[in-house]
Amino acid sequence: MDASRASQLINSRETDVYCKSEPVIIRSVDEYSKMATVESLNNGTTIMAPLNDIRDSGVINH
């Protein structure tokens, strides 16, 4: 995922976002390092992940 798209999805629950197949919420994005802080929706843990590991489903939840 590119940094611009990741920034649009910060704290969003309207679009499903995944990091290595695990559902997450993007909490912050560092465009310089191309890393994002993500929180797991499964267990609440927060990790730093490369933007390349983050995908969105393209499905908007209402």
Swiss-Prot record:
UniProt keyword annotations, A-Z: Sporulation
Subcellular location per the Swiss-Prot or TrEMBL entry: Spore core
CC annotations in GO: endospore-forming forespore
UniProt KW Protein transport keyword: no
Superkingdom per UniProt: Bacteria
InterPro entries in the cross-refs: SASP_SspH
GO biological process: one example: asexual sporulation
Pfam family, one: SspH
UniProt keyword Zinc, yes or no: no
Similarity comment text for this entry: Belongs to the SspH family.
UniProt name for this protein: Small, acid-soluble spore protein H 1
